[in-house]
Regions:
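Solvent-exposed loop segments that connect transmembrane elements
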Residues: 92-116, 201-238
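N-terminal, post-signal peptide beta-strand-biased segments of exported outer-membrane/organellar beta-barrel
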Residues: 24-144, 148-149
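Residues that define the transmembrane beta-barrel architecture of outer-membrane proteins
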Residues: 57, 125-130, 174-178, 242-246
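Outer-membrane beta-barrel channels and translocator barrels
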Residues: 71, 139-141, 187-189, 255-257
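Membrane-embedded beta-strand positions of outer-membrane beta-barrel proteins
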Residues: 74-78, 146, 182, 194, ...
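Residue-level signature of outer-membrane beta-barrel architecture
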Residues: 67, 136-137, 184-185, 248, ...
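Structural signature of outer-membrane beta-barrel domains
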Residues: 81-85, 149-155, 199-203, 212, ...
């Protein structure tokens, strides 16, 4: 009976840890995310986050874990990204026809369409992303942290005359953040922490706009079926923003060898 209870408890513990592991996975939309873990995290597939002993990336990822760092520690990491993106597929205009170039015959006035066949070429990019972390214990209960991170970004460049030009041509989003954080050790098993981030974002998103196709959707023009692929204009939206954010976390050490963490950004 005792053996069966041990099996049940072991199964229950694994189920809880499995649930925590799933819940800890980051949720993100389209784009690219730069890992903000420490350099050693690459070697362990970022498992365990910033809960390992004397991990300075806790200054950003989970400030509560700084409370268990027993000495000043710093780290600088330079990440290099080489992303290949290629498109294979079809693209259609507003009328459901394959994306094409439309030219009006000067003699007859009738439109002549030539399908676009370009796949956009190499849409990927290369980038360097530096990160740095510093944690300084203040006393037995408090620790202070600083970090410089590149939380996310995006970069795609497609040929201007490719078949998907009405959806994307050139996109660039760059972010950089400076953070400060503080942790408090409640006892030898539990700690909490929080911090703030000053983040600067720059970039642009561009795509072509089919002016005649847009006009064809206007009720003021009686939904006149203008030919697609004729009136084109490049639209570019730029962003340049500096804003404040915050993050918080907690860490619990149920045993001397295990640590569970929860963080919010």
């Amino acid at each position: 009976m005792k053996h069966n209870k041990q099996q049940v408890l072991a199964f229950f513990a694994l189920a809880v840890l499995g649930g925590l592991t799933v819940a800890a996975c980051p949720v993100q939309a389209g784009g690219f995310m730069t890992p903000t873990a420490n350099t050693a995290g690459w070697g362990r597939a970022f498992g365990g986050g910033s809960l390992f002993r004397n991990d300075p990336s806790a200054a950003f990822n989970n400030p509560a874990a700084m409370a268990f760092i027993d000495r000043p520690v710093s780290q600088f990491t330079l990440n290099y990204a080489n992303i290949d993106i290629k498109y294979k597929g079809s693209a259609y205009d507003y009328a459901g026809n394959p994306a094409s170039i439309t030219v009006l015959d000067p003699d007859t006035g009738l439109p002549t369409s030539t399908p676009r066949t370009g796949d956009g070429g190499q849409g990927g990019f290369e980038a360097w992303a530096p990160t740095g972390f510093t944690v300084i214990p203040i006393n037995e209960r408090f620790a202070f942290g600083l970090s410089q991170v590149v939380p996310m970004g995006a970069r795609t460049t497609w040929d201007e005359d490719w078949k998907g030009r009405d959806f994307a041509v050139d996109t660039k989003i760059e972010t950089v953040g400076l953070t400060g954080s503080l942790s408090f050790k409640v006892n030898d098993e539990f700690s909490i922490g929080g911090g703030g981030i000053l983040q600067h974002t720059t970039g642009f998103v561009s795509q072509n706009v089919d002016l005649y196709a847009a006009a064809a959707q206007s009720p003021d023009l009686g939904y006149t079926p203008f030919p697609a692929g004729q009136g084109l204009a490049l639209m570019r939206v730029k962003v340049d923003n500096t804003s404040l954010g915050w993050f918080a976390g907690m860490a619990w050490k149920p045993t001397s060898r295990d640590t569970l963490g929860l963080n919010y950004h």
